[in-house]
Amino acid sequence: MKRLIIFDLDGTLLDTLEDLCDATNYALRSENFPERSLDEVRNFVGNGIRLLIERAVPQGTPPAVTDRVFGVFKSYYADHCMIKTVPYAGIADALRLLKAQGCLLGVVSNKADAPAKAIVAHYFPAVFDSVVGEREGVRKKPAPDAVFETVKALGCTIDELVYVGDSDVDAQTAQNAGCCCVLVSWGFRERALLESFSPSAVVDTAEELLKELIK
């Protein structure tokens, strides 16, 4: 069993898709842009909220208009990020069991730092030893910077780490960090894509994830 487990947030621990979609469409409506479907937003997420909005606005939208939409999104999502969001089945229990086993637990997310911390504190109080979201001056995933920051802050080494995520971005993050990777199939990407990165495992339930992590 690894000493430190770092989790992605959206699509791994929490199903945040409906709140993200609602905030995206609220922001798009502010400029009378067409709304996006849940499946479209699913494909847009993973690289941070700025890229989510850049992908959601119509092609050819002037940068200044994209900036306005992004501002509306950030303001709305900050107040509406926990309306429909729910933990995936079995995740809360799995985290408690890992904590009881003495594991250090962290979150590294491309979600903005403030809402990432607020959401984790709300849904998983007193569970995580570190939560790091997107901040200015720190490269977001798949760059390994926030992973390295977490490893150092918790007094661990890369060899003591397993990274858990649900996307190609997460697989690339683990590869760039040089650490073990487990991917979950219940998130925002198809299983075939996840398997193409040859992770240590692709799991389908929280119970399977727990078994993989405590081996």
Q: What does each model-found stretch correspond to?
A:
Residues 1-3, 113, 117-215:
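Asp-based, Mg2+/Mn2+-dependent phosphohydrolase catalytic module
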Residues 2-43:
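Active-site neighborhood of HAD-like aspartate-dependent phosphohydrolases
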Residues 6-8, 108, 164:
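Generic enzyme active-site microenvironment
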Residues 24, 91-121:
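Substrate-recognition element of Asp-dependent hydrolases with the DxDx(T/V) motif
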Residues 30-60, 89:
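Alpha-helical substrate-recognition element adjacent to the catalytic core
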Residues 44, 48, 86-90, 111, ...:
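Short beta->alpha linker loops
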Residues 54-93:
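Metal-dependent phosphoesterase signature
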